[in-house]
């Protein structure tokens, strides 16, 4: 029934008039108002037709006699009154909606003026497209760096594994060298112990040799002293005998001469001289016997001292003992010479062994230092590789977190603009935003944005407003002097915009989370300055109009 439709339309229009309305809601209200106006006009036409029919009925018959006609007239009058009341209510609602429409139109005009006119949507779409392309480019670069970092991380893992295998091999070699060094040290200790034993034996032999030498020298000195004494006694005895023999010969010659002279002497004188000569000869013999007895006594005393010293009573045995002692002394002398030669040989061997020990010590020390240095270098390289691997893992996690955040933002935008339809889900799959279908999601978002803009343009065309004509003719709503220009963000690096030298970027690995945070904190003000700016057409490009909004 038309009245019921109009009532429902009026109710919906009244409910939609509550709250603040956007541009899309305004277009919806306009279409509802048009429908309500058409319904009101239709009701007015029906009311006029009913009034005309009623007048025609009442013209010929003021009081119809037919009760059915009277009931119909009453019913029609009631319906006319009800429709009149509804018309009044609808007119009130129409006035209220017109007032809201005018308010929304003024709000829309003010918003458009603040945003820069009818071109703001197009410029925003262009800026969004540029931003999307820039983000896609950065995402592609991030993927490239991520793949490079994964490859480099794999190479570093292989290098770390090789270094670990080399470390195990070096540790095995070091353990073998340590065992060889310990064996050499044990051999060296044994050689030192043997050398010490040889030294002790040498010292002992030298001590015994010195004792034997001292004893032999002492015995030799005693023997030589006794021998000198005996030789002196024998020489003196020999001299005494020769002197006594010479005296005896001289006396015999004198006696012979005297006997020759006695031939002329008397017998008494002969007897006297013979007696005197006999006395002299006896005296000389007695003297010689006394001297020999003294020498024998002296020899006896000397032999007695030798016998007391040696404990040997027999002279032959004493002589044999003396000869045996001489032979033993000579044998000991030869033994001492042999021992000295052996000691010299042992000293030479000890010096050679000491040289070899020192050589092995130096070699072992150099080998230990070399192995220690190599081990330290390998540990440093391993620590650096592990630190670099951890750094790459952190950067990989940061890149993954950035990719995850980007996926979440794209999914949120995808849900907000109404792209999540069954057909799209069938096309893209149910797994959501992934690295494989990221560009497909962005393409659908772009397509949906263009569709929304086209729907908006069609609604404006249906309304036939001047704003749509200006939009179609690309004419600004505001005056040229007050035109607002939206500056798109720059695609150049912030350092190039500021005239600064760009930071050196290492291409072989992605940025770490700390580096990204510091870079964002450092470049965020410049990004805000280089973002989408709204400024008047006559204002300076760098300064802008005071109070003009900045859209990111």
Swiss-Prot record:
Domain of life the protein comes from: Eukaryota
Job description of the protein: Component of the outer dynein arm complex required for assembly of the outer dynein arm-docking complex (ODA-DC) and the outer dynein arm onto the doublet microtubule.
Effect of disrupting the coding gene: Impaired motility and outer dynein arm defects.
Gene encoding the protein: ODA1
Compositional bias of kind Acidic residues: 493-506
Stretches the record annotates as Disordered: 1-27, 482-515, 528-552
Stated name of the protein: Outer dynein arm protein 1
GO BP field: cilium movement involved in cell motility; outer dynein arm assembly
GO cellular component: outer dynein arm
Subunit structure: Component of the outer dynein arm complex.
Entry annotated with the keyword Magnesium: no
Matches recorded under Pfam families: ODAD1_CC
Family as reported in the entry's similarity comment: Belongs to the ODA1/DCC2 family.
Coiled coil regions in record: 28-59, 120-260, 331-395
Biased composition (Gly residues): 8-22
InterPro entries assigned: ODA-DC/CCD (IPR051876), ODAD1_CC (IPR049258)
Cellular location(s): Cytoplasm, Cytoskeleton, Cilium axoneme
UniProt keywords, alphabetically: Cell projection, Cilium, Coiled coil, Cytoplasm, Cytoskeleton
